[in-house]
Amino acid sequence: MGRGVGCAVIAAVTAALIACGGSSRPQATRPTSPTVMAKDTVRTQPAAAPSDSATRPVATVACDSTHRDSSAVPVKEVAAHENSPRTGRSAKAKAARHPHHHHTGCAPIKVKLVRVWPAAPTPLPGALLPNTRIIAFYGNPLSTRLGVLGRMAPQVMLDSLAKTAERWQLADTTTKVIPALHLIATVAQGHPGADRKHRLRMSDETIERVAQWAQARGWLLFLDIQVGQSTVREELPRLLPFLARPYVHLALDPEFAMPGGEIPGTRIGTLDAADINYAQRTLAKLVTDSGLPPKVLVVHRFTTKMLTGAHQIERDARVQVVIDMDGFGTPQLKRATWHVTVEREPVQYTGFKLFLNPRNDHPLMTPEQVVQLWPSPHYIQYQ
């Protein structure tokens, strides 16, 4: 383990994460989604609560002193998702300090913390996570107001995404980066529409156009559903022909889900774990029936009430669930919201949204800053 006669101690201590509840920290907000002005007509077991999350041993604690430290104390372990140098809180502690260390004659102890956040299914062959970081441009080509995907001319937007992905690759050379287009395929509306569901479904032609942009470049496509006064059960099936393609994945936006019948945009909406589990089972069946690699399911969140029963979200290796913190504000406010809505309610993987409009994110966090979050996000979205 080192030079000379060293001493080693294997230590592991479980760190409990708070599963739910409020926080005195402020929470970031995000703008409401404006109406698109276009005429475009094997069940798994529920996930264990965070306090039951699996832990892995802390790495060997090495002492280079010739004196054996018989009073060494276990080092506290903080839970995290991956044993990876990419985690926001450094995997290598500078030193382990204990009030009794001066009695041992031992040199400063180097500690490597292995974080587990939480226990996720072992990735199946072809799974994107955790070995890939997805960099996505969000929006709708029919609106300049919904995000960067529709704000620029298509070729300009695609070139910009490619360059953005390159910057992320430089920020973390240990994780492969792949670009993605995140299309709002079902857009919540202030107007009720013909069926009074307060949502507008994009035509197959519009979805196909964006799909071809992604497929031609070997990128990913995410289809985002804002159900309005509809439901996930109503909206998901029509997208299955697209989701049957290996490069197409799913996203759900609770902000615009109005189970109480409110008009989207007048209040922050909500989805329950039951909605997420339905989507997950549907995708898992599609993966099995069509022989596909695992799907990614992104769920947006910037308040705790946007997603109820998070600890009841099932774990199925065929579907990798990402909780995407999509609030805006200063870096301090975004980190506080991250702590409350992601870090304290672990599901599987994590995502982080960045708003290019300086009125929303001020200043815009850099890739180097974002990769230091813990757990380090695997999904990054620009709006």
What residue spans do the PLM features occupy?
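Sec-dependent bacterial lipoprotein signal peptides
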Residues: 1-18
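Substrate-binding surface in catalytic domains of secreted glycosidases
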Residues: 254-292
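Alpha/beta catalytic barrel-like cores
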Residues: 20-52, 56-200, 317-319, 333-383
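Substrate-binding cleft of extracellular glycoside hydrolase catalytic domains
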Residues: 167-171, 176-255
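Alpha-helix N-cap and loop-to-helix initiation/capping positions
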Residues: 152-156, 198-202, 231-234, 267-278
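Active-site beta-loop-alpha junctions enriched in small/polar residues
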Residues: 140-142, 184-188, 226-228, 255-257, ...
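Aromatic-lined carbohydrate-recognition surfaces of secreted/lumenal glycan-active proteins
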Residues: 227-232, 288-306
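Acidic, His- and aromatic-enriched active-site or binding-groove loops in soluble protein domains
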Residues: 204-207, 243-254, 273-277, 317-333
